[in-house]
């Protein structure tokens, strides 16, 4: 099973295997290596995935979700990530092209910003060797990682209040 999740500060790709033969783990590591090296970002696949994302946005569109998003700037006052959601807006989803994805990947998918976690009932030395064999030769980037200036949280003192909804 393959899945991914994007939050405000990271994207995680997950493979869930019911079995864990060395060949199957190698196949999964090749999949992750492909993500690290750079997907092709086929324009037709981008259109298809955009439709999937828009459908996901529609399925999540609820009063509760809108309230949560409206509360972010209040709860996290001063932090820049409250201006957008990880999924984006319909406008950005429809306007992104292959070159946007390539640039985002080039800037953010770097060996020095990658963490690989393996959990399961397997020999730790064997899995460490497979991971090292798959990712050890990724070229180190010369340019520094991007600096994310998301602002500074404006701390407030504690306060109490009564809220009435009628």
Each model region followed by its residue ranges:
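Short amphipathic alpha-helices in soluble, non-transmembrane regions
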Residues: 28-33, 128-135
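Short amphipathic alpha-helical coiled-coil/interface segments
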Residues: 50-57
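M16/insulysin-pitrilysin zinc metalloprotease superfamily fold
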Residues: 15-49
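Residues marking the start of alpha-helices
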Residues: 37, 89-92, 118
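Helix N-cap motif at beta-to-alpha junctions
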Residues: 19-22, 120-125
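Non-catalytic beta-strand/loop surface segments
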Residues: 1-23, 44-45, 59-113, 133, ...
């Amino acid at each position: 099973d393959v899945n991914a999740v994007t939050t405000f500060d990271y994207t995680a790709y997950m493979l869930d295997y019911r079995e864990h033969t060395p060949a199957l783990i190698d196949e999964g590591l090749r999949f992750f290596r492909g993500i690290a090296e750079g997907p092709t970002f086929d324009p037709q696949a981008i259109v298809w995935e955009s439709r999937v994302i828009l459908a996901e946005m529609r399925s999540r569109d609820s009063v509760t979700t809108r309230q949560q998003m409206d509360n972010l700037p209040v709860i996290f006052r001063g932090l820049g990530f409250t201006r957008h959601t990880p999924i984006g807006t319909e406008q950005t989803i429809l306007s992104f092209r292959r070159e946007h994805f390539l640039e985002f990947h080039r800037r953010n998918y770097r060996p020095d910003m990658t963490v690989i976690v393996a959990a399961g009932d397997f020999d730790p030395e064997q899995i460490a060797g497979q991971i090292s064999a798959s990712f050890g030769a990724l070229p180190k980037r010369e340019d520094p990682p991007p600096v994310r200036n998301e602002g500074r949280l404006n701390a407030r003192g504690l306060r109490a209040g009564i809220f009435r909804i009628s």
